[in-house]
Amino acid sequence: MNTLQKGFTLIELMIVIAIVGILAAVALPAYQDYTARAQVSEAILLAEGQKSAVTEYYLNNGKWPENNDKAGVASASDIKGKYVKSVTVEKGVVTATMLSSGVNKEIQGKKLSLWAKRENGSVKWFCGQPVQRADAGAAN
């Protein structure tokens, strides 16, 4: 009598395991990049919340606010998120500082700044690595 065997051979199982390993190796870096972007977007969102107050202060006073209090926003330690330690306003530059733990290792403790320049009668905002303005009265 001939018996019919059902199931996978060892070779077939090894091939499936190899394919799953390759897919995981490709997906993991993409996932880590995605989580870092999501964490940085929180920093941008919290920093952007201060732009209108900084702009209004500049337009009313002709100089950039020296700190959070002058800008009329909450203190730096009160503006925080799940991944953001604090958001400071210093001479009109809004800087978000990432936490040193619990975030993607590439952005731990890093800072992101938003700063404005007066151009043709309007205020134009920029985003990038931390900057410092030498004088609060400077137009740029």
Predicted feature locations:
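Periplasmic/extracellular, small/polar-rich flexible segments of pilin-like filament-forming proteins
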Residues: L59-N140
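Residue-identity detector for threonine
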Residues: T3, T9, T35, T55, ...
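N-terminal single-pass transmembrane signal-anchor helix
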Residues: N2-E42, L46, Q50
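Generic intrinsically disordered, low-complexity segments enriched for polar/acidic and small residues
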Residues: Q5, L28-Y31, V54-T55, K80, ...
